[in-house]
Amino acid sequence: AKPLVSASNPPATPGLDKYSAPHWLGARANRRFHVMAKPAGSACNLDCAYCFYLSKRVLPGGPGSGHMPDDVLERFVKDYIDSVTSDEVVFSWQGGEPTLLGLEFFEKVVTLQKKHARAGQRIENDLQTNGTLLDDDWARFLKQQRFLVGLSIDGPREIHDHCRITKHAEPTFDQVFAAAKMLQKHGVRFNTLTCVHRYNASRPLDVYRFLRREIGSTYIQFIPIVEIRGFENMAPGTWDEAKLPMLGDPRCHPDHPESVVTPWSVAAEEYGYFLSKIWDEWQARDVGKVLVNLCETLVAQHMGLPSQVCVHSEICGKGVALEHDGDVYSCDHYVYPEYRLGNIRQQSLGDMVFSPRQVKFGYAKSETLPAYCRRCEFLSDCWGECPKNRLLRTPDGEPGLNYLCAGLK
């Protein structure tokens, strides 16, 4: 029988290993990748309790915060357009809080995109924001330039304001709710991004129905908050595996005084409860009306289509992070010196994304799965979720089990 050809087992090329095989990941004809740009670095006007990015400003050897210089911005816009071979290029602007740079920065972005776009090429922009700085001028610009806005909101007032507060510990719900209504008034396309954490995971339907009915969101994204204790200075995969708790150990729970994760991390079982309740509601009432990222991708995978989210894909690595100073990292959850790929002032984005080092990073998602995962009936649905969340050992003692495993099952 012929060996199975899959994403983690590509066809052989004489003289090349799979990490450098140009026809698989790096072929010029197939150079499609995504860059998450952080033009203000970790700078933000909020102080959300669970934010993993604020600490980058003091990370030794890290990117800090700042304002992307004009030369770096133009280099990025031109290089990204030149490096991607598809007819569509999507620029994603995140943070920190990118609107801190002001409307003028993004007017400059659009001007540069028009300057460097190839004939017939479609340029799209999306902007992830906490919404607190948006006003009518912003909304008119976003509408005119066809930006897709991602609005961060965690649910009803009492849930949202538990974690998403200002530097002076003031609530932000009213500002974010007003931003949603203003975007609707101006006809700006937007979706919602909701973090699932220790303080809202027990109220899935309150969160979902609020987003659906009060905010009017028709594209809802949920992301779990999972952070290992000491994440501020410890890059994923650099921890002592011998000290990781085994599945079922009390230290797997965020309430335990010696928990492997921070107190605000979602508990695995609660995350499973949260998703199950939302799946039931979505399936019964909202299929075809509301897009829920984790529900949609599960349906797609069961139809034989690839996952729509990186964490449930067999391989990753085609989504890198660009910092304000031009440094490029393997992923926005891997913005640590150990995962710095280079700087766009010296290297092209394409060369960094399709370098053997980054390709190995992408393949490691499936290649490093423990045997417990490889024989799991849900492997093709999960693929070990995000590698940065592999904080447990299996019942056999093998490291590499995802913290959310029990909940995802």
Model-predicted segments: where are they?
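N-terminal [4Fe-4S]-dependent radical SAM core
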Residues: A1-A37
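Short Fe-S-cluster ligation motifs
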Residues: R75-Q94, F361-A364, P399-K409
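Short, small/polar residue-rich loop motifs at catalytic or cofactor-binding pockets
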Residues: S313-C316
